[in-house]
Amino acid sequence: IQSTSMDQGILTEDSMNSFIRTLIQAGIWKNKVPKQTARTKDGMQTTVKKTEAEADAMASKGTRLGFQPVVSVDAELLRQQRRFSSPRVLLSENAPLQPPPLYLTEEPTVLNRTSRRKREGKSHRGEYSVCDSESRWVTDKSSAVDIRGHQVSVLGEIRMGPS
């Protein structure tokens, strides 16, 4: 995992792996087939997948197979992982009130230059130019297309003043 200068904390591969392992152990990383605990003859507990008959019974009750309800993340798990702070990922106990800004400089608390923000406007996600703009004079054109899409001829010389 590479860390950028925008990251507030230091992320190492070991710490992220342990975090992912914790999520997997908590059962929120993958959807699981419902399991049932059963006792063997010697008294040991084992986990057993539900039989097809039980799965059919669940399906008849309106429960879809392969569907697991949204699992809430334990608040203690979030408190333990506070060190993973990043502008792209935020682990929080509360739902966000609004979508995050694209860049940190778009936040009004970070950027108090309102005149610059009004002048430049906010950047928009996913908007990229399809071609590079070019600012130079073109002198060898004899025809062009105007803003309404009509073909027009380009004058090579414009005479001004009394003719």
From Swiss-Prot:
Keywords: Cleavage on pair of basic residues, Glycoprotein, Growth factor, Secreted, Signal. It is found in: Secreted. Residues 4-119 form a propeptide. PROSITE patterns: NGF_2. One of its GO terms (biological process) is cell surface receptor protein tyrosine kinase signaling pathway. It comes from the Eukaryota. InterPro entries: Cystine-knot_cytokine, Nerve_growth_factor-like, Nerve_growth_factor-rel, Neurotrophin-3, NTF3_N. Residues 123-132 have a biased composition (Basic and acidic residues). Residues 112-132 are annotated as: Disordered. Seems to promote the survival of visceral and proprioceptive sensory neurons. This is Neurotrophin-3.
